[in-house]
Amino acid sequence: MIRELLLIGVGGFFGAIFRYLISGIVPVKFGLPTGTLAVNLIGSFILGFLLYCSLFAPIPTEYKLFIGTGFCGALTTFSTFSYETFVLVDEGLLFKALLNILINVVGCLIMVYFGRVLALAIFR
């Protein structure tokens, strides 16, 4: 168990640093946070590639923990959401995939709003 936690932690260390660097390098375009978009897209690609490769070839658990859970987890949680949505699509559950997208996007926006409301209530 300690080994697995270390793999996740070290992967997360590198994922967080990569997120910081990429977010700082990519300029804001069209008034949108394109740095965040960039890391979300990169993380989604990496996790999708890793997990879909594992359907066709054995990928060691250590790689999945280090790259998938650690690196991509720190880089973005959006990668897991994207992969899970495509699993629903692959299983022919298009309605559930669309519902997953709607709930995640709208739900996360609502939670940010609630966090904002709480922070303003505390610090104003």
UniProtKB/Swiss-Prot annotation:
It holds the Pfam family CRCB. It catalyses: fluoride(in) = fluoride(out). Na(+) binds at G73, T76. The keyword Thylakoid does not apply. Na(+) is not transported, but it plays an essential structural role and its presence is essential for fluoride channel function. InterPro entries: FluC. GO terms for molecular function: fluoride channel activity; fluoride transmembrane transporter activity; metal ion binding. It is found in: Cell membrane. The chain crosses the membrane at residues 6-26, 37-57, 69-89, 92-112. It is a multi-pass membrane protein. Keywords: Cell membrane, Ion channel, Ion transport, Membrane, Metal-binding, Sodium, Transmembrane, Transmembrane helix, Transport. Its main location: membrane. Belongs to the fluoride channel Fluc/FEX (TC 1.A.43) family. Fluoride-specific ion channel. Important for reducing fluoride concentration in the cell, thus reducing its toxicity. This is Fluoride-specific ion channel FluC. It comes from Methanocaldococcus jannaschii (strain ATCC 43067 / DSM 2661 / JAL-1 / JCM 10045 / NBRC 100440) (Methanococcus jannaschii).
